[in-house]
Amino acid sequence: MVNVIMKISSLKKGSNFSINIKNIKLDKKLLVAIIFLVLSILGGGAYLYYENEKTKKLEQARLQKIQKENSDKQTYLSDFKSAFEGLDYQALTGFYDVLRSDIDFFRVNNWLLDVMDCNVNCNLAFKRGSFDTFTYLEMNRNGAVIKPQFDQNKLQFANVDYISGFRSIYLKDLTEQERDKSENIIEQCSTKLSELYNLQLLMKEQVKFKINLPRNVTSISGYDWVKNSDIKFGSIEIENMPEKNLGLMKNIMNNSMMITSISLQNSSFKSKLNYYCY
C-alpha cells in the first residue's frame, strides 16, 4: 500500500524518473516472491520425495525383519527337534523349566513349541518343588545335561541377557498382578503334567510317550495369554504300554484328564488322554 501511494505522489509532481524507480522496486519484490514460491514448491516436493523414500525403506526393513524372524524360527525349531530327538529322558516335569528362560520370547513371537516326543528308553523321574509343583528338570544323555541347541550366530536371543531385555520391553505394561497371574497359569498347567508321576514305572518298559503341551500356554499371541486365561487343553499319547500295567492308568487319571482313545495290540495298548488346566 505504501508503494502505491508513493507512485501517485510522484505522478502529481510529474517525476517520471521517480515512478520508474518505484516500478523497478516493485518488480524486484515480486520476483523475490516468485522465487521464494518456486523454492517452496521445490522444497515441498523434495520433502515429500524424502518421506516417500523413508517410508519405502522402513517397509523394506520391516519385511526383512519378518523374513529373518521366520528364518530364525525355522532354524530354532529344526535345531530344537534335533536336540531332543532320540534322547534318554531322565525327567519330564522340568520341560517347562528348561524352556522357561525362553518362554517370554516364544510368547512375544507366537512360536509353536508344544510337542515333546520320546521314543527311546523313556524314563520319567519327577522332581517336585514346593506346593507339589515341580521347579526343575534336566535331560541327560551319557551323563551330560542336554538343552535345546541353536545357532548363536543367527538368533539374537542366544545372548544370556536376552531374557531380562525381553521382559523389560514386552512385559513392562503388565501390572504385577497380571504377571503373577501369567506365572500361575503356567504353574497350574505344569502341575497337571506332574500328575503323570506314576508313569515313570512304565517308561522302563520301552513305552513310547508323547506329550502335546497346552498350545495356548506355550504359544501365545500378544497379551491375550493374560487376558484370555480360560481352559487350556493338551494331550498325552502313550504306545507300547504292557497290558499288565494297564491298572496303573488309574494313578494317572484325575478330574482334569480323560481318555479319548485306547486300543490293544500284541499284549500292549495305545491310548490318548486329554488334559486341561485353568
Curated annotation (Swiss-Prot):
GO cellular component labels: plasma membrane
Residue ranges of the TM segments: 30-50
Topology within the bilayer: Single-pass membrane protein
Keyword line: Cell membrane, Membrane, Transmembrane, Transmembrane helix
Protein origin, superkingdom: Bacteria
Compartmental location: Cell membrane
General function of this protein: Involved in TCP pilus biogenesis.
Name the record gives this protein: Toxin coregulated pilus biosynthesis protein D
Taxonomic source organism: Vibrio cholerae serotype O1 (strain ATCC 39315 / El Tor Inaba N16961)
